[in-house]
Amino acid sequence: MRFLRHIAVVVALAVLAVGSTIVNAQSADLPDSAPIATIGAGSTVSVNADILLPANQGTIYLQAGSVTTWEQIDKKAPSCRLNAVESPVVRRLVPGRKLVITGTTQNNGSVFFYGDVLQFEEDATVSQFQCSPGHKGAMNIGELKQVFGGMFSLIQAPAVVGE
């Protein structure tokens, strides 16, 4: 009888170990080499720096962790443009604010420069990031992090498997 109890305990521990491994595998972040189009909905872009959004301007360009202009961007290096909702007043993104990603689109290898897009949950300030790796093909997560520098962080949502 005791022997059966020990077997039940061993089986329960094995099930817990396998379940824990599966959960850990599902919640692992995508590698930096993965295309940004694979970033899951529910992931967030967290604001780490105080960023002013100028009045009457709907686009802010980012490269290597700083705000820049279209004229100053190195077109052969990763960059993004943040599409802000046009407003007659100056606004700001404050540290700690999270922009929830609802989806991604990709216009791989086209003549359209900003072909990789992170779309955000409806927001009164920011609608999306449009990004370019600076080369033909898709932008990857590592290149996105390079663009963000210390200004933003990507927080990936756990993967949902089988739903």
Residue ranges and their predicted role:
Residues 1-11:
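Bacterial N-terminal signal peptides that target proteins for export
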Residues 21-25:
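Sec/Tat signal peptide C-region and signal peptidase I cleavage site
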Residues 26-103:
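N-terminal secretory signal peptides
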Residues 46, 51-62, 121-133, 137-139:
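Solvent-exposed hydroxyl-ligand-binding patches built from regularly spaced Ser/Thr
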Residues 49, 103-108, 148-156:
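Sec/Tat-exported extracytoplasmic proteins
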Residues 101-124:
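SH3/SH3-like beta-barrel superfamily modules
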Residues 123-163:
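C-terminal partner/receptor-binding element of secreted or periplasmic proteins
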